[in-house]
Design a protein with these regions (language model features):
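A generic signature of intrinsically disordered, low-complexity regions enriched in glycine/proline
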Residues: 12, 81, 91, 119, ...
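Compositionally biased, low-structure terminal segments
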Residues: 28, 34, 71, 177, ...
Length: 326
């Protein structure tokens, strides 16, 4: 894989990535591709900065592969439509079926990112969901259930995947558990979380909502919709409230100025501190000793002194007893 460089769609200026800033591909449990810093163990494995970098996944579209090998792997899944999921499918099967996916830091390809999709999307089917469910059914084994939780197990009609499963068996590919342990060991596993799902206030039908996926936004209260997405949260075994790589972060300090303290989302850092929480008798308590409270207008979410008699500080959150079953 090359480094994908951005070409400005107005000026055609090329923005080049410094070799020290190269990232590798990953994915979240919505089965969406994302970028990650190169892990320390991978940096240590390489002898010089121009050496290839192993990557768990790729963005797709820009890569080189031997044609015969590509066909042996089954090419792209013919049951997938238009766009979405195909890059993760080829990433997983390359690694799980004996290959290796690497980024070559000295290879650069410029790309103009479209502002809108040029495709005509069918109105009667969620194409991306169909594609990613096919991907999950064939390659994720029991880990597919973490994705299905977020879909409320509404898989839709994803077609027949028997031929793709037969291909995997014929190629004698590794399990997805092997992939996570050997290729992407830094990936957060939802089954290790203590709580999961929506965080619903006991006084009002309001849930804690990320207000979009942009880092640095304040958590808000929003009518519970039961669709996951912005309202799907997990508490890790380390006490982080997170969705994939985004964690609740509370720095404090505003209350001393007579202002209300908000909670923001930032990249998870696994260091505790601002990102460490616990659930105590329905209250969500921060390391600082303050608790999460829904404001009287049902929209604001603030940190306040803990009061077990204040129902706006009481939340319902599903406790995970076991990993989801197939």
């Amino acid at each position: 894989m090359p480094l994908i460089e951005i070409i400005d769609d107005n000026t055609f200026q090329l923005y080049s990535t410094p070799i020290e800033s190269v990232q590798v591909g990953g994915f979240d449990w919505n089965l969406i591709f994302d970028w990650h810093p190169v892990p320390r163990y991978e940096m240590a494995r390489r002898k010089q900065k121009t050496d290839p970098i192993r990557s768990p996944t790729m963005a797709g579209g820009l890569f080189a592969i031997n044609k015969k090998y590509f066909e042996t792997l089954g090419s792209y899944d013919p049951g997938m439509e238009i766009w979405g999921g195909e890059n993760l499918e080829i990433s997983f099967k390359v690694w799980m079926c004996g290959g290796e996916l690497v980024c070559t830091p000295c290879s650069h390809v410029g790309h103009i990112f479209r502002k809108r999709s040029p495709y005509k999307w069918p109105s009667n089917v969620n194409v991306v969901r169909k594609n990613t469910v096919r991907l999950a059914e064939v390659w994720l084994d029991d880990y597919k259930n973490y994705y299905y939780e977020r879909l409320q197990n509404d898989l839709g009609n994803y077609g027949d995947v028997s031929e793709r499963k037969a291909l995997r068996e014929k190629l004698q590919c590794h399990s997805f558990d092997w992939y996570l342990k050997n290729v992407f060991p830094e990936q957060f596993i939802p089954g290790e979380s203590q709580y999961y799902g929506e965080i619903r206030n006991q006084a009002e039908p309001q849930c804690l909502d990320s207000n979009g996926d942009t880092l640095g936004k304040a958590i808000i209260g929003y009518v519970c919709h039961g669709q996951g997405g912005n309202q799907y949260w997990m508490m890790s075994k380390n006490g982080e409230i997170r969705r994939d790589e985004h964690c609740y972060d509370y720095a404090g300090g505003k209350s001393a100025l007579g202002q209300k303290d908000k909670i923001f989302t930032y990249n998870c850092h696994s260091q505790g501190g601002n990102q460490k929480w616990q659930v105590v008798d329905g209250q969500i308590k921060h390391e600082s000793g303050f608790c999460i409270e829904l404001s009287a207008d049902k929209v604001g979410v603030f940190m306040q002194e803990c009061d077990k008699n204040n129902v706006r500080q009481l939340w319902k959150w599903k406790k995970r007893e076991d990993k989801p079953k197939a």
